[in-house]
Amino acid sequence: MNELTKEWKVSGYFGSKAASGLFQNIISMMPPHETYIETHLGGCAIMKRKPPALNNIGIDIDPEPLSNYDGAYPVRLVNECAHHFLSHYDYTGNELIYCDPPYLRAIRSSLRRYRFEYTQQDHVRLLTLLKSLPCNIILSGYPSSLYDDLLKDWRTIELQAMTRGGPRTEK
């Protein structure tokens, strides 16, 4: 596969932060960190564009994003469930996690977009786990009452993004 095809394939991933320019906003909000952990890689738009940390870890249960990763710096790629990895990782407090899980089915325009779907209970488990971790976290998604209820103490920022279905608010 040539580089042009590979690049198109990665940036064309559903929920990609590359096409809308959303990645610049997300990267600009990142606090200093020694270890960068990105879960639910998808098209790797953030991982490929942010400056490298001392340690970089990309996690996805789907092997396809891992095999398509062609970033400019070394990344430990992990083909595993994000919940499992995050709950067993040995944290130092110098980590930043960027988490962009599949969008809730109830708030998206198409129900058949992900090869590895999340149930509502999977979202609850993930959010509960993220709240318990001793590090900085940036979480992407569309506004939802589930996220608002479970993360009511978290700071939220809304950004406008252009999607295949038109403009949407990322939160």
Q: For each of these PLM feature ranges, what is it?
A:
Residues 1-171:
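Class I S-adenosyl-L-methionine-dependent methyltransferase catalytic core
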